Amino acid sequence: CCAHSAKNDVDDVGFIERVVNFTIEMHNVDSDRIYASGWSNGCAMAQRLAMESSHIFAAVGCMAMYLVNDPTEQYSPIPIMEVHGFLDQIVLYESTILSIPFNEDMWTEPEAYETGAVENMFEWAGHNDCSGGVKTFEMNALYSIQGFDECANNATVQLMTIFAAQHNPYSNDNDDGTLIGSSFIGTQGLVESSEIVWDFLILHNKSNLSVGSF
């Protein structure tokens, strides 16, 4: 989706679509309930799949990154949820400026400097033809979930903000045995963000997406 993959025109979307289609052919898969998720650049990839492969995916829920690719004419609104730590030290909550050196496709894109978690939510609300103001779906001492639920295709848009989380908004630390990985501490079990995202995803399937409904 991004970084060297985008610069070198690697067809990540085409590859993932082929993997999905092959899996459907070989296994008993409910093709109405195919979802995409990811963390950091993986979240950017998941949102690119939402934009470019909305005919395949029923919903997307991902962690700690924004849509960094241009919108496409073939996009049909699907539900989107992005989870972001307010204290994210890599992909800032207010902008992607610290991510730009690592994503060469963003170097000449001025709007890349402007995108933050809230802006990303509003951009998806525009893509999904949402109306009305921002709603608060959940608010407590640890996190909030806000967004839009009056959208085309019933394609709600949600932003989950974890107030004390950094770049790793998951419950557990990123213990991959490396110095960099060990610096990405999770919420220590205080916020089960994966479960919340999964609960969001399973509410949606292709059969429930009805164009023009709110």
Language-model regions, residue ranges each:
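Short beta-strand immediately N-terminal to the catalytic nucleophile in serine-hydrolase-like folds
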Residues: 36-38, 63, 83
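Acidic catalytic loop of the alpha/beta-hydrolase fold
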Residues: 88-91, 167-169
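Hydrolases whose catalytic domains are alpha/beta-hydrolase-1, hotdog thioesterase
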Residues: 45-49
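Short beta-strand/loop motif that positions the catalytic acidic residue
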Residues: 82-84, 88
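C-terminal catalytic histidine-bearing segment of alpha/beta-hydrolase fold enzymes
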Residues: 83, 112-116, 125-212
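Gly/Ser-rich "nucleophile elbow"/oxyanion-hole loop immediately N-terminal to the catalytic nucleophile
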Residues: 1-41, 51, 56, 131
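Extracellular/periplasmic catalytic domains that process cell-envelope and extracellular macromolecules
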Residues: 28-29, 37, 41, 52-55, ...
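A conserved short beta-strand
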Residues: 55-67, 78-79
